[in-house]
Every structure is written in C-alpha cells, then in structure tokens.
Design a protein with these regions (language model features):
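Metal-dependent de-N-acetylase/amidase catalytic core
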Residues: 2, 10, 24-53, 140-304
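Bacterial N-terminal signal peptides
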Residues: 9-19
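Active-site rim/loop-helix segments in enzyme catalytic domains that contact anionic ligands
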Residues: 24-153
Length: 304
C-alpha cells in the first residue's frame, strides 16, 4: 500500500508532467505558419498617425499589395517611404525592349503610382539590382544598404513580404530573397557593432523596428484587416493602373499610352485586381501583423 509520502510524490510528478502531455497532444493546425492571430496592434492601423513607415519590396509594383493601406496612412499624417531592391528591368515579353529602357519605364511608373497615393518622389529608394538576380547578389552588401536606410529613416513600421512561411521557399526568386533580406536587415540594424562604420563615421544610430506588416502570405496567417473603402480604394486602383508595362498589352508590345479600345477593359481588370479582397462587401487589405524583436518574426505562437 502506498505511503503518504509516495502519494505526495505521485501527485507532484503528475503536476510536472501533465502540462507537457497536454501541449504534446494539442494538434498543430498551422502547418508551420506563424499565426499570432491573437496579436493586434495596440492602436488600430486606421488610427495610426505620426508614424514613419518603410515598405520594402523586390520590384517596382510590389508595394501594390499595400497601396490602399498606404493611402490611408498617408492621409493620416504618417510618413511613407518605399524601398525597392531591383529596377524591374527584366519583366517584359516585348522582344524589342532593353533592360536600360525598361528600368527607366518602371521607375517612371512607380513614381506615378506613388504620386497617386500622395507619396513624394524623394521618398522612393531603388537599390538598382537586376531583376531576377537578387538571390545571386552579395547578401552582405544588400543587407548593409538596407540597414543604412533603416538607420537613416528610423521607421516605426516595416511592410515587407512575409518571410515566415513555407510558400516563400518556392515563390518567385526575388520575392523570396526580398523577404529574407528585409528580415535580416531589420535584425542587423539594431546592433551597433554590425556595420559600425554607419554609426562611428556616418553619424547614424542603431535602430529597432517595433512593428511589422507582412504581405503576400496565406490567408490563415493574416491577423489584421484594413478597410480601404472609399477614396483609398480608388487611389489604389489609380496607382496600380500606372504600371502599364506589367498589367496591359504593353507587357508584350510596349507603348506608353494604351490603345483606345483597350482602356476601358484595362481599367476594369485593374479594378478587379486591386479590390479582389473584400469583407462585408467592402474592399480590404490583409496582413500578418507582428510586434516585437526581429528574431521572433517567423515563430509560431508559443515557440521559444
């Protein structure tokens, strides 16, 4: 017969083991996706004001995932900066197009799109890398440049491709690279002994980005929905429409102006593309919001 001491020992053992048994039996339905569905911004995104926002993408037009939200943030007196890593100088099927010409076209299209959102030209940064070749670039140099701009702008919020899920491993090479490079730069920017010359010789300060808005991920990973109805939806449509070289017949045979018989169809297609995500009949944009240290960007809830 067990003694009282034995009973106490068994009870203590059960108390120690039971929590781990419960956790082990809890099914993982995320498929490795960082969820964080219970994490929300302390202040709703549509009430943000006075923040500095940095959007990082691979190509001119990658920021279109967030055009509606950027329009809203700009109206609410937030400062928006857009950093694109490549010139987009390969994205065409036009046999007569050259890299140099397409690079200039895509710069002009991006600036026109940003203007439609109220974002000034001097808030646009392009690192100048060749489209499709980002993963072969010197990673240290790319991260160094990104860190420089993070330390210069001191952003409160980073918008970027979501690096924290399996889809990126198989997606378009530049998007995959941009997602990881942005995360690596956010991590490096806060450590003063990484790229110390920027601090010791260029007068910059180390900087930690506190909030992240990731786009391009699966719906089940997204935890923030931004209502872009009204003027912001229309601004998004107009901004995306500026990328003629990517979304019209100019993709195969570039002309700076659409043929008259294509204009109506083009704008209809752009509108459908821009406003394809809705909630309660209203256009929205969805993101995976994360707040905290960069090392936790890709962790699932409860991981350490």
């Amino acid at each position: 017969m067990p003694t009282r001491t034995h009973k106490l020992f068994l009870i203590l053992l059960l108390l120690c083991v039971l929590p781990y048994t419960t956790l082990a039996q809890e099914p993982d339905t995320t498929g490795g996706i960082p969820t964080g569905a219970d994490v929300q911004p302390e202040t709703p995104v549509d009430e943000w004001t006075g923040k500095t926002v940095l959007v990082v993408g691979a190509h001119p037009d990658d920021d279109s995932y967030a055009y509606g939200t950027l329009s809203l943030l700009r109206e609410n007196d937030n400062e928006i900066h857009v950093l694109i890593m490549t010139t987009g100088n390969v994205g065409t099927k036009d046999p007569d197009m050259t890299r140099t010409r397409l690079s200039q076209i895509r710069r002009e299209e991006e600036l026109a799109a940003l203007s439609a959102l109220g974002i000034p030209e001097d808030h646009y940064i392009n690192l100048g890398y060749t489209d499709g070749m980002l993963e072969f670039a010197d990673k240290k140099e790319v991260v160094k440049q990104l860190v420089y701009h993070i330390r210069t702008l001191q952003p409160d919020v980073l918008f970027a491709f979501d690096p924290g899920y399996g889809y990126q491993a198989w997606h378009k090479t530049d998007h995959r690279s941009a997602s990881y490079l942005a995360a690596d730069a956010a991590r490096a920017a806060e450590w003063r002994l990484l790229f110390p010359g920027q601090i010791n010789h260029e007068g910059l300060d180390a900087h930690r980005i506190e909030e992240y808005m990731f786009f391009g991920g699966p719906d089940e990973a997204k935890n923030v929905t931004v209502d872009i109805s009204g003027a912001h939806a229309e601004n998004k449509v107009q901004a995306i429409s500026k990328h003629l070289s990517q979304f019209s017949s100019a993709w195969r045979d570039y002309t700076p102006e659409l043929p008259p018989d294509e204009r109506e169809t083009y704008m209809q297609n752009i509108r459908e593309r821009a406003l394809d995500s809705t909630e309660a009949g209203q256009p929205v944009e969805r993101f995976r919001y994360y707040e905290g240290i960069p090392d936790g960007i890709g962790k699932r809830r409860g991981e350490y």
